Amino acid sequence: MTELGEIAPAFVDLAHRIVWCTVSTTDPAGRPRSRVLHPLWEWDGQDLTGWIVTSKTPIKQAHLAHSPYASCNYWAPTHDTCLAECAAEWVDDVATKTRLWELFKSTPAPLGYDPGAIGVPGWTGPESPSVSLLRLRPWRLRVLLGENLQNGFKATSWRA
């Protein structure tokens, strides 16, 4: 098993190159639900944290109340893949929401974007009640480059 310090930079690099991922949660009956979202990952050399600016919809709230976990699966046409299985929690404090809003705005495209300019009703700023922030704390990571898949190499994995 690989150490977090070895896999996290490779995961962040690949996730940020692919940008969009399928995020899956489960409902109270154990059925999966997926949606395509746009996390931004921060690696400080010790901790890896993912952030998603999103809406706190009734479905997302119910799923995370039932099971506070999410799976983030990235795929590129080259068959590069990476996966983060995470504890997921809502973050409501305005200071953190403001920091992440500005981070998304200041990060170069295609990873960065202006959350207030994408047309979601009510997304006028980080203090807006319709803007929610989801924090992801991985407990499992997996990275596999397409070229390694073709050569029969196994994925690099980490688990907390």
What are these regions (language model features)?
Residues 19, 48, 84-86:
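Structural detector for hydrophobic anchor residues on beta-strands
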Residues 22, 49-51, 142:
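General beta-strand recognition
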Residues 36-38:
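Conserved beta-strand in the GNAT
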Residues 40-79:
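A short mixed-secondary-structure module that forms the rim of ligand-binding clefts
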